[in-house]
Amino acid sequence: MSVCTKCGNPNVIITRKQSGQSLCADCFIKSVDKKVQQTIRREKLLNKGDKVMVALSGGKDSVVTLDIINSYRERHVIDLCAVTIDEGIKGYRNEGVDIAISHAKRLGIEHKVVSFKDCFGIDLDEIMKTDNHRGSCTYCGVFRRWIINRTAREFGADKIATGHNLDDESQAVLMNYLEGNINNLSSLGALTTSKSPKFTPKIKPLREIPEKEVGLYALAKGLDIHLAGCPYAQESFRMEVGNILKDLTKDHPTMMYSVIKGYDKLKPLVKENYPPEFHQGDCAICGEPSSNELCRVCTFLKELGHRVQL
């Protein structure tokens, strides 16, 4: 019977294939906290006095991000706030919103719930009933980023923290490479910034934590999380890439780490030759940064017969 490598506790909750480490709940929590703190320190994700807005869906990744970053708030290093987006998916979104509200109240932080309906005059359920929609994920990603960035400015946030984990990041690296999206590759990483003052820098504290460990961390700490999957989730190229990586990881446990470590070494060269797209103008309707007359949000809304509710 295995015992905790760190303290000898026989109640082991995980054995890491990549290192052979067996850990009890307490030592596992400490190891994840330490790994995230190392990422924050090495990548300079937080500065003293920062106001950080967490994109809080109520799912495991965002709840764990909030929980770990809150330790910096408790030490008076940063100020913390959160935004939760209600896409308007009946029978699914309400639970996640309620969980997010509960966590924000528990920590006593500023929190806003912003809906697609209030911002755009139409929610995702209504969009999916139209005949000419582009697919749920297309709208959801673009609309969510618009709301997150705009709300960060309203909060006066210096950073936006998202719950992207190791699986997410390694998928993004491989997916963009396979599709030849080199400009997109240059905008990945633990910290992403923009030349536009209207874009708030984004940080990914969980970037080196596997998805499985994020879920186990939430369970070990007794954190309430939204477990349901989105009813609009569909098989996508990202999912295919994710499945490939998971299959490779079975025999090569360090594969996902290798993907992002290799990417981090190449990033300076990629960024130098393929800089991220800079939106030099502003959208004629909503005023958000855009290279064209209309940003993607306003373009999509125009197709749907709606416009941003300013």
Residue ranges: model-predicted function:
Residues 1, 13-18, 268-279, 285-290:
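Short, flexible, mixed-charge glycine/proline-rich loop motifs
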Residues 140, 280, 284-305:
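Cysteine-cluster motifs in flexible loop/terminal segments that predominantly coordinate metals
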Residues 125-131, 240-244, 289:
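Short, surface-exposed amphipathic charged segments that create phosphate/polyanion-binding patches used
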Residues 22-31, 258-268:
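Short, structured interface segments
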